[in-house]
Amino acid sequence: MRPKFFLSLLLLFNGLAFGQGSTSYSGYIDLYYMAHLSDNSLINLPYRMFDLTLQHQNENLEIYADLAMEYAPKSHSHYLSSSTPQDFLWDLRELYLTWYTNFGEIKVGKQIHTWGSVDENSPLDVVNAFDYYYLFFQGSDRKLGSYSAALNVYFNNWKFGAVLSPFHQTNRFPLNDPEFPISLPIIPEEKQMFDLGGNPFEFGAFLERSFSMGDLRLSFFQGYDRMFNFTGINAWGQGASLDRPRLDILFGYRKTDVMGLGGTILSEWFTVRGDFALFGTHDVNNNIGRYHDGELYSQSLNEYAYAATEGIAAYDSLHLSYPMNENVDYFQTTIQMETELPYDIIFTTQFFHYDTLNYSSNILPINDTINIPNFNFASGSFNPKNLFTPGLGTPLAVLSKQTVLFSLEKTFLDNQLKINILSLFDIANPEDSTKTFDIWGSLWGFTAEYDVTQNLKFLLGITNIKGKDDHPDKELYRFNQMESFSHIRMEIKYFF
């Protein structure tokens, strides 16, 4: 379906190009260097070396395309594991058609949407999946395009928007990448993913009202989580015997409804923005019984292995099936304030908070200890709530349940030089939730941008991350994991 869709857009673009209209393009070339502060060793993470945007408008129709080249530095050049010299890939980030009407606009294609009132980390910004390689970037740079249709209708001070996508979008995670500071505790194999089945449509809408002193927005979105969850276990036996069971450990994606409220208050002295989202998520996999592909998890081998070998009876009987049936309510909120201080310094602060309101799930009714990769548990002590991670909302929830951010920005030399100082503090106390202002982890950032010419920019940045050794999660604490990611980076960026 997707190749046919893009072929149709390309044919339409070709037709528009030969008709009346105007075409414009812009982009950049980015030379990027990043190294650890600890030992100056190179950090081999992918980044977008080249980006090209193209716009063509013919009367009330417009085509927009964004093509990027992602460069992935090689850790070596021995060519022992692969003989290919290619170290980049092309990414068509956006390609969509816009039809401007007398009531608004209609967009169809692969596009990046922006929902919410705050500049960054909005819990309402759930339409697109995130690329975690670009987690520390801003705006659309850290999002993945969604194959969708969007509608915007304008009437006086009102705005109505809607979006519909026939595809389920998932986050891009760095898998077993030692260079990336955040890792997933469990990385399932493809065979362990339980198919959503049918057409996993995602849709949402918002209604916005503008006032002289700001605006107010109500929104709703229904879709599937961007991150997988543990959905259940099947226990297989040899015929009627379950003496030596083998397991099929399954993961899936919960279905989530998001109710949102956001707004902006403008004044002569400051601007306040806020977003609040209430999430209701449930596991739709009530029946997880299915045939296996010949491989099942062996507790003795501690890995997936063929379930039928010479001299061993086949595992052909599904004896037990335990769907988790998670049902969770949680909320996320982000409040932002920005103002101008003396000496033309722009001050911005953000407060983020997330918590679980209600949690329920089935219990695994197994008496013996189950040994599963990366989470060994006994039925009496295992609490599935400890595995819960929000599948929608701001990616900031991956780092902490409660943070506060401060940013100072100042320009010099007739806006040719821009200095930014940023700090992020984890104030979520894991031992006593009533103590809300204890600092457990921190991130400090310094960035200097200098416009060498109108088209050439030089950037220098330093990021320092600190965890806390006495945190109850020890090495699993996110800020402890990220300490080694403290780095210095330099960029030379040419715009055209």
Regions found by a protein language model. Name each.
Residues 23, 60-65, 103-106, 157-160, ...:
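Repeated loop/turn-to-beta-strand initiation elements of outer-membrane beta-barrel proteins
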Residues 480-496:
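Outer-membrane beta-barrel "beta-signal"
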Residues 57-180, 212, 463, 467:
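Outer membrane beta-barrel
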Residues 50-56, 94-99, 149-153, 205-209, ...:
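Residues on the lipid-exposed face of transmembrane beta-strands in outer-membrane beta-barrel proteins
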Residues 42-48, 88-93, 143-147, 154, ...:
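Residues that define the transmembrane beta-barrel architecture of outer-membrane proteins
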Residues 31-37, 58-60, 69-73, 101-103, ...:
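Transmembrane beta-strands of outer-membrane beta-barrel pores
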Residues 77, 178-188, 229-251, 284-323, ...:
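Solvent-exposed loop segments that connect transmembrane elements
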